[in-house]
UniProtKB/Swiss-Prot annotation:
<dbReference type="GO" id="GO:0070888">
    <property type="term" value="F:E-box binding"/>
</dbReference>
<dbReference type="InterPro" id="IPR050433">
    <property type="entry name" value="Myc_transcription_factors"/>
</dbReference>
<dbReference type="GO" id="GO:0003677">
    <property type="term" value="F:DNA binding"/>
</dbReference>
<dbReference type="GO" id="GO:0005634">
    <property type="term" value="C:nucleus"/>
</dbReference>
<feature type="modified residue" description="Phosphothreonine; by GSK3; alternate">
    <location>
        <position position="58"/>
    </location>
</feature>
<feature type="compositionally biased region" description="Low complexity">
    <location>
        <begin position="278"/>
        <end position="287"/>
    </location>
</feature>
<keyword id="KW-0010">Activator</keyword>
<dbReference type="GO" id="GO:0045656">
    <property type="term" value="P:negative regulation of monocyte differentiation"/>
</dbReference>
<feature type="modified residue" description="Phosphoserine">
    <location>
        <position position="292"/>
    </location>
</feature>
<dbReference type="InterPro" id="IPR036638">
    <property type="entry name" value="HLH_DNA-bd_sf"/>
</dbReference>
<keyword id="KW-0656">Proto-oncogene</keyword>
<dbReference type="GO" id="GO:0051782">
    <property type="term" value="P:negative regulation of cell division"/>
</dbReference>
<feature type="cross-link" description="Glycyl lysine isopeptide (Lys-Gly) (interchain with G-Cter in SUMO2); alternate">
    <location>
        <position position="143"/>
    </location>
</feature>
<feature type="modified residue" description="N6-acetyllysine; by PCAF; alternate">
    <location>
        <position position="143"/>
    </location>
</feature>
<feature type="modified residue" description="N6-acetyllysine; by PCAF">
    <location>
        <position position="316"/>
    </location>
</feature>
<feature type="domain" description="bHLH">
    <location>
        <begin position="353"/>
        <end position="405"/>
    </location>
</feature>
<feature type="region of interest" description="Leucine-zipper">
    <location>
        <begin position="412"/>
        <end position="433"/>
    </location>
</feature>
Amino acid sequence: MPLNVSFSNRNYDLDYDSVQPYFYCDEEENFYQQQQQSELQPPAPSEDIWKKFELLPTPPLSPSRRSGLCSTSCVSVTPFSPRGDNDGGGGSFSTADQLEMVTELLGGDMVNQSFICDPDDETFIKNIIIQDCMWSGFSAAAKLVSEKLASYQAARKDSSSPNPARGHSVCSTSSLYLQDLSAAASECIDPSVVFPYPLNDSSSPKPCASPDSSAFSTSSDSLLSSTESSPRASPEPLVLHEETPPTTSSDSEEEQEDEEIDVVSVEKRQPPGKRSESGSPSSGGHSKPPHSPLVLKRCHVSTHQHNYAAPPSTRKDYPAAKRVKLDSVRVLRQISNNRKCTSPRSSDTEENDKRRTHNVLERQRRNELKRSFFALRDQIPELENNEKAPKVVILKKATTYILSVQAEEQKLISEKDLLRKRREQLKHKLEQLRNSCA
């Protein structure tokens, strides 16, 4: 039943008093004298133009998907009697009554929830909001719903009159309602097309399908199943096709909207990689794009800096002269190669290169000098195990050690000379003894 909520204590004529300062009238002329004498609300200034901007009614609502309202016309319909007599059963509702209740609920809710008042009341028609062009769409929708309900109620009253063919008339009325519902369902957009993801509620029953809407639901289900099973397999966008041809221009426009919605949803699912592959199907295999970035190689000069906190090195062989020559040759060769590979530069760039080369050579010279000090330190017995010996100490200890070594050398040379003389004497004595024995 429609939910009609009316407030009897509210006077809708007072609505004009709140907006009266916004309407400008000439003081010499009284345009609303006749209306005030008849105690009617004066019309709004936009009364002559609101018909030009009358809005069209809203699109048809989607059919209900409840299981109690989804019985087809093939099921035997028992007539309903509001008096509760024996032939109607009193407590059972026929398909026509259920569909009428749904229609009344949908229409009544749309009007009564928008305006909390009775649509049959005169104050509802006289309200200034209805006469305004911005609110004309609601009045047009209410008028359309009321006319449709009135025609259905008149048909039901004719069918409810006592006659021998009462069951047949109720069945025909129910088939009329079912045809109207199927037409509305065919005009509506299937929610599964707009929202193609499966619902979690698997226990909810499916909506009733009429012969006209069964083809649409079958085609949409097959389209969705093919899209969900292989969303990336088809490179071309899928388009929604209906088996039933469109009857009006509004149907064709809604079909175009359905097609656009479906194309957008399918194209969003395709990754950019698949689109590129679909754009060029002749390219075979996983061929990489011809992308060869320019890599500029920079020469790396190995710089060795001594770590004083590191443990003592056990390496004793330091061919300093050869290493200096080889490193200097290698660095100069790398610098010359870099100059050959690069393009001719300006004078500033050449100066920077010279400065960089000088810094590299100077750093290499210092490293070699440091290595020489380390080698000298390792040769001194007193500083052999001292990793943190300064250079001055190394030089002093090295000088002392060299002098001591030279003194030892002179001593050993003198001893050698004495031993050689002793040998000569012994040889001469042995020769004399041999001659005496002979």
